């Protein structure tokens, strides 16, 4: 029997640190539900002390997960951080506190301003302190990839002696070469007393494009947990992509003496879900889940694949959920058919909620002959984005053309239910719509990025607009909107981004 490799997903914590990829609690719960469906072993749900939103996310995901997986909260090696994480994790049946500090010379000297001896003592203390609350404590040695190996051994020994159940060896800056990183893991396995009773974890970044290779090299040398994100989301160039390491282990299980429990046909759905929620598009040539991952344009390749798929494909698309049958719904479809299909897509609703969903489905079905999975997912996610809406776009009319001045008339409701009807002109229909919104909302953001794509099929496809706006403090907020009318989609996206900006400000104020 091959070794079980634990998959630790940090999409909701490290992945969310990608600029513009922030998610609210409701969106995190949708992603967490998909991670549970996929069978990941650990969900790192957030950094509880960082904000009330992260605290609530850890609480709610802990409640959602039940016995299905471990739920983890991140902390610094600071007592108050650990106290806060422990409080958030009270809802989890399988809680884990993830605590630690930097261990490289630059971190000790320039960031923490401590000596090596003080670092070792802090490592020992933070693990011991966390063990007062939970049995499962993971220690991270930040920037281990650039640390002195003998010193790293001392730090990890202190964490193991203090009772750590997992020790995380991050290549925080993506600096290491795979073989050298693997040697670090083997050195720890050979020199830390008692480490055979502890899981070694690897957390690698993609700054030099080697995150997956680094993680697999860690597995070859004794690591039994990989920390990763859907689509490789993460700071700077991102983290190890979950879909890549999982499929690499599946394809080379015997060579690596390893397997995972991830349900691989859920990978593509997870990728699309995270992409849509965060507004971070997946590059077409992305391994495993990109639009071109199973596409063949060369005549020679096409001929080969038609004769036998394995001539140019090492993975069956169905193994990652890239192919399969679907139920196509229409205005004639009843409650049962819609509820069944939404359940298969991972969405469940209470009866009173489902009535609203069904009514929205009928609105779409009246505009389209056939409603596909992409329509349903867009519909549900748009509804989730509106859960805590401060401003809601109720109606929009736009007139433009040569020689007309583009004019937008918008009806917008605020959180008190007051309806505002405003009119504005602009350089184009979208600009006019945005200026109309600005007449009502209490804040303003500068448009930094605008993108549009068809997320369903046909000439009557639903178009989704993603915008990123920059607030006065320089922070970027993402908004998304979907509609058959692209101008309406644009206005919805802008309002969504404004709502996020206001919600974030209120969260920081504890409101």
What is the role of each PLM region?
Residues 4-5, 9-11, 247-249, 254-423, ...:
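A mid-to-C-terminal "edge-of-domain" accessory segment
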Residues 14, 18-19, 47-52, 104-106, ...:
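Short, small-residue-enriched loops and turns at beta-alpha junctions
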Residues 176, 183-307:
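Catalytic alpha/beta core domains of metabolic enzymes, predominantly
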Residues 407, 416-441, 445-456:
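Small-residue-enriched alpha-helical segments and adjacent helix-cap loops
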Residues 476-478, 482-510:
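Mixed-charge, glycine-accented linear interaction segment located at domain edges/termini
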